[in-house]
Design a protein with these regions (language model features):
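N-terminal catalytic cores of NTP/NDP-binding nucleotidyl/phosphoryl-transfer enzymes
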Residues: 13-90, 204-237
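Short polybasic/polar patches that bind polyanions
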Residues: 26-27, 63, 94, 121, ...
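Active-site cores that bind ATP or allylic diphosphates and position pyrophosphate for catalysis
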Residues: 71, 75-77, 83-84, 105, ...
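A glycine-rich helix N-cap at a beta->alpha junction
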Residues: 85-110, 116-119, 124-127
């Protein structure tokens, strides 16, 4: 074997499973031969070095194959999000040496997501449930036992449409009703058991103010945002493996009437970065800061990127 062939063989062996998937898609001419990824943080805290791994993967895959990685802020929960974190996240990404293509927000798609939800109600694929969260959880069943259908599951379509509009008009208090997708309460995948796709949140949004009172859940916004933007390879950590069938189903629904295989994006999952004796959770780091157990995000000894910028 020549030196060049040996080098090529080594490089080929070094491909990870995501790179293999991307190369296979390119060879088959999928997605018009383009590669587009995204880094989708929620602006509810500062990034930590676990995010740095995801950033390197999202941006690295796009760069390796001549594509683009966009930055999308998953801002669907106004109670926890702030523009302070938006600016800090952008600063951290640039400090790591990367530059995004376009800057997007899930809130850019609130109208499209709302229209999609309305269509699902009209098609009998979603309904308004007036049970509280404890009742809904109790009816979910277990991984080995089917769930119980909500008494509101088969309510008239016009009634659900009217109530959905009231959810967004401010007439409905938080926790009083939700919009659920009508899928399969006996599915072995718990995420298919009529998941909640919209809830009422009356906290003003950092971008849209008080325009919206009904907000999409992550599982409903994530895959559709990928679709709206033209993402080809959606990279997530392993806890989203059980969510992938739901991701695919919602994409099928939003693409209904179109070629399901045309420009079809897929979700791929990878391991989180974990360090011994180190908190690697933005949520838990935020608790430390809010409870004044540390002196701030840039305190030495923690895993936030703020410590290193």
């Amino acid at each position: 074997m020549t030196e060049m062939n040996a080098t090529e063989a080594t490089e080929k062996k070094s491909l990870n499973f995501i790179e293999q998937a991307v190369e296979n898609d390119l060879k088959e001419g999928k997605n018009g031969g383009k590669v587009q990824t995204r880094f989708p943080p929620e602006p509810n805290g500062y990034l930590h070095i676990g995010h740095a791994k995801a950033i390197c993967l999202d941006f690295g895959i796009a760069a390796r194959y001549g594509g683009v990685c966009n930055l999308r802020f998953d801002d669907t929960n106004p109670t926890k999000e702030d523009m302070e974190y938006v600016e800090a996240i952008k600063e951290d990404i640039q400090w790591l040496g990367f530059q995004w293509g376009n800057e997007y927000y899930a809130s850019d798609y609130f109208q499209q997501l709302w229209d999609f939800a309305v269509n699902l109600i009209k098609e009998g694929k979603a309904y308004i449930d007036e049970q509280n969260s404890e009742q809904i959880a109790a009816q979910k069943g277990t991984p080995t036992q089917p769930g119980t259908e909500s008494p509101y599951r088969n309510r008239p379509i016009e009634e659900s449409l009217e109530l959905f509009n009231k959810m967004n008009s401010g007439e409905i208090e938080e926790g009083k009703m939700v919009l659920r997708a009508k899928i399969d309460m006996a599915s072995p995948n718990m995420h298919f058991r009529d998941p909640i796709i919209y809830r009422v949140v009356k906290t003003p949004h950092h971008r849209t103010g008080e325009t919206w009172k009904a907000y999409p859940m992550y599982d409903f916004a994530h895959g559709q945002s990928d679709y709206f933007e033209g993402v080809t390879h959606s990279l997530c950590t392993l806890e989203f493996v059980p969510h992938r069938p739901l991701y695919d189903l919602f994409v099928d629904w939003v693409k209904e009437g179109k070629d399901l295989d045309d420009n079809r994006h897929h979700q791929y999952e990878f391991n989180k970065l974990n360090l011994n004796y180190t908190l690697m959770s933005k949520r838990n780091l935020l608790i430390l800061v809010k409870e004044h157990l540390v002196n701030g995000w840039d305190e030495i000894g923690r895993a936030s990127c703020r410590e290193r910028v």
